[in-house]
From Swiss-Prot:
<dbReference type="InterPro" id="IPR014726">
    <property type="entry name" value="Ribosomal_uL2_dom3"/>
</dbReference>
<dbReference type="InterPro" id="IPR022669">
    <property type="entry name" value="Ribosomal_uL2_C"/>
</dbReference>
<dbReference type="InterPro" id="IPR022666">
    <property type="entry name" value="Ribosomal_uL2_RNA-bd_dom"/>
</dbReference>
<dbReference type="GO" id="GO:0002181">
    <property type="term" value="P:cytoplasmic translation"/>
</dbReference>
<dbReference type="Pfam" id="PF03947">
    <property type="entry name" value="Ribosomal_L2_C"/>
</dbReference>
<comment type="similarity">
    <text>Belongs to the universal ribosomal protein uL2 family.</text>
</comment>
<dbReference type="Pfam" id="PF00181">
    <property type="entry name" value="Ribosomal_L2"/>
</dbReference>
<dbReference type="InterPro" id="IPR014722">
    <property type="entry name" value="Rib_uL2_dom2"/>
</dbReference>
<dbReference type="InterPro" id="IPR008991">
    <property type="entry name" value="Translation_prot_SH3-like_sf"/>
</dbReference>
<dbReference type="InterPro" id="IPR002171">
    <property type="entry name" value="Ribosomal_uL2"/>
</dbReference>
<protein>
    <recommendedName>
        <fullName>Large ribosomal subunit protein uL2</fullName>
    </recommendedName>
</protein>
<comment type="subunit">
    <text>Part of the 50S ribosomal subunit. Forms a bridge to the 30S subunit in the 70S ribosome.</text>
</comment>
<dbReference type="GO" id="GO:0022625">
    <property type="term" value="C:cytosolic large ribosomal subunit"/>
</dbReference>
<dbReference type="GO" id="GO:0019843">
    <property type="term" value="F:rRNA binding"/>
</dbReference>
<keyword id="KW-0694">RNA-binding</keyword>
<keyword id="KW-0687">Ribonucleoprotein</keyword>
<dbReference type="InterPro" id="IPR023672">
    <property type="entry name" value="Ribosomal_uL2_arc_euk"/>
</dbReference>
Amino acid sequence: MGKRLRQQRAGRGTPTYRSRAHIHPGPAKYPPLSGDTLRGKVVELIHDPGRYVPLARVVREDGVEFLMPAAEGMYVGQIIEIGPAAKPEAGNILPLGKIPEGTEVFNVELRPGDGGKLARQAGSYALVVGRAGAKTILRLPSGKDKEVPNDSRATIGIPAGAGRIEKPIMKAGFAYHKWKVKARKWPRVRGVAMNAVDHPFGGGRHQHKGRPSTVARTAPPGRKVGHIAARRTGRRKR
């Protein structure tokens, strides 16, 4: 009998594969919508092990406290503005309809009040490129243009932590801890590189699958690897 696959072992929910959720400070999102323009103070900058971007703990003048991805250059004690009448300066939170064209923004809401969904990674940002009626056209980090409602909020500037990939990992032990804290299974060994006892694609005198890579949706867990319930594989015929 063969050994269990990686996804079968992970499915048991043992500490080896479980996310260390207790070490994360909390969700990073905007507070509930408010039509007023309020000021907030950055009281703490936090390293979240599950993210590459540092978090800023902000306390508004009405006492509401929330976490947000820190903008580049943000510091403890900084006063930021939150609302439609805020100035378009780095760290301030405004509706997209109030942000001038050509401005770099991040942590953009897809729908007003959802807390922020787009351009949240360290060093990534979206660019306000135009208007289309009740929507603002954004150029996303992928290069695609997307229309977002004018009432959706965004933070002015660029998320802190840019340039993180410039530092080499150097050794496998660093990579182990990097992915362990982010709830990612690592290392990811190819099935064809395994022995026959470890994977349906393993074994043989050279690395090859040795069987069709497509598998039925109803296949048992030990066989369910490869292209699951695929309509086609490879390039589409012209």
